[in-house]
Amino acid sequence: MKKLIVFALSLTFLFLTCCGEIPVTETTTQEETTEPEIETTTEAWEIDRTGEEIYQAHPDLTPVDYTSPMILPLSEDMGQEYVDKLTFICDSPTYWMWPWGLLGGGEDTNSIWTGPEGTMTLAYQSSYCILDPFDNIEKPIRQVVEEHKPEYLILAVGINGVSFMDEEEFKADYEDLVSDILEISPETKLMCQSIYPITPAYRWWGDITNVMITEANSWILDVAEEYGVPYLDTFSVLLAEDGHAKRELMGSDGLHPNYEGLKTVLQYIRTHKYREVTKAVG
């Protein structure tokens, strides 16, 4: 009897379905999809601690804060092609890259921006005119930046302010220059470079010492952290174990790196390539 009832119900259901009384729900089989694997790579950044042992041996020097995320780490050698893209706003220790033909264009380079006498002073940066190498006309720094908007710009100034500027004055002028460059040319990849060490052969040794320079370099790093600008520790690459500049890399005046010294600086820069860094919070 039960089988007959089930059979009758089945016939009824079939009849109603064929007549359209009961809707038929169409089912589809969803194909299983898998998300494509995204290859992620984490680049290991190795901080170059070149001068660490020297700072430990000379506690009077202000050591580099190697924990700072602004310090550019070791990278692959970017080669002369990278160097040829660099522009420097600089004072006299870096100026000599120009006459020695170390940058793009050789002795005809347009990559050294400084005063007509081959130097400039940080304290006067707001009003000082540098020589625009593209037309040999003296112009305010900011005007030259606005007109040419370089791809890479390295700020290599400060030695001419170390002897008479305190921390507040030094930072104020350095910040003013950095913030204006970032505003005028936001696509420019700006880097801050440390002041080079000197030797006691410098005739004004005492008015300027490496103790003072390392302190000023810590101020530069502070500004770099505030504005999220990468920092090049070019001081340490020229530093000898005695806490002064390596004499074989310096000119006889004790202030300016010689040809090999500036080649050493550029080798450091091209093996510590620009990368974006995270601005300090607070």
Residue ranges and their predicted role:
Residues 2-89, 93-99, 276-282:
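N-terminal secretory targeting modules
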Residues 21-23, 78-81, 139-143, 160-162, ...:
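Extracellular glycan-modifying ectodomains
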Residues 76-172:
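Conserved SGNH/GDSL esterase-like catalytic core that processes O-acyl groups on lipids
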Residues 87, 154, 189-191, 230:
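A structural signal for isolated positions on well-ordered beta-strands in alpha/beta enzyme cores
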Residues 98, 146-149, 158, 175, ...:
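Sec-exported extracytoplasmic/periplasmic mature domains
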Residues 156, 160, 182-214:
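Active-site segments of SGNH/GDSL-like serine hydrolases
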Residues 167-177, 213-216:
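Charged helix-capping and loop-helix junction motifs
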Residues 197-282:
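Catalytic His-Asp segment of secreted/periplasmic serine-dependent ester chemistry enzymes
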